[in-house]
Amino acid sequence: MWGGIYAILFSIATITSAENPVRNGFPKIITQPYEKITFSKVEFQDKIVGSELQYSHYLDRKYGPIQPGYSISVTDQGGLWLGSGFIKKVNLDKNIRLNFDFFPGIYIQSKEVDLGGWLMFRSGIELEYKIGKLWSVSIAYDHRSSGDLWKYNPGLETIRFSLSKNIM
């Protein structure tokens, strides 16, 4: 359920963007690229079952209000996820942003929990605080599931803490 809600929030934030209304289409805009390292607790069926380390890279362009990126993560049980998608940032204050992301990707289970298939969609909500011109920290909640592509689709959540650095 949460993944669907996050996907809807991502869509609403994108469509209603004050910075680039959808009526303008999705023009290519040069923007600040950045990298993010994320440390997470993995939650499965309301229980913390492990940890995850994630690396994300966001490109030097946006299409309208959304910035493309790619990401890879590995859990302490060897579960691997890699994907590519978009982030939408909403400025709440000079240094505070509310971010929504949507990343389709490939899931390799290893000894991790069975999520029902190999194609997984990650969507999340993140509160980010900018520290100077280069750094930011954030906390987030993320949902990963197949979007009911397979009969068995239990989903997986992560509770994330991230450190990001702009690429100069």
Question: What is each model feature region?
Answer:
Residues 37-43, 53, 57, 68-74, ...:
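Transmembrane beta-barrel strands of outer-membrane/channel proteins
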Residues 41-52, 72-83, 92-94, 110-118, ...:
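Solvent-exposed loop/turn segments connecting transmembrane beta-strands
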Residues 51, 129, 154-168:
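Outer-membrane beta-barrel "beta-signal"
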Residues 52-56, 83-85, 124, 160-162:
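Membrane-embedded beta-strand positions in outer-membrane beta-barrel channels/transporters
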